[in-house]
Amino acid sequence: MRFHGRLLTAFALPNGLGHHRFGITASRKAVGNAVERNRTKRLLRETFRLSGDALGTLETKYDWVLNAKAALLKVKLESSLEDFQTIVGQAAALEKRSNSQGARK
């Protein structure tokens, strides 16, 4: 599944484990030099760490890959957290919709 946010793009695949895992990409083309890439990676790591409650609402555990966008450099942690939690909400809605369709068959 792919989800687009204002500050990041997230890819999620079910992993069959009892916990979520995540990876980060922050390319020089998309974000900038090493200092900027490292800052975006720190922001995304902290965003994922603080999103534990939102991720707990998902029945399925996923492998997440978060792709940083250049706009992430211009915002505070709260904006990044809000954007990712919106994405998790979209994933939960998609999961709920697919579960309800599976129950009808």
Where in this protein do the model-derived segments appear?
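Positively charged, solvent-exposed patches that mediate nucleic-acid binding
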Residues: 1-105
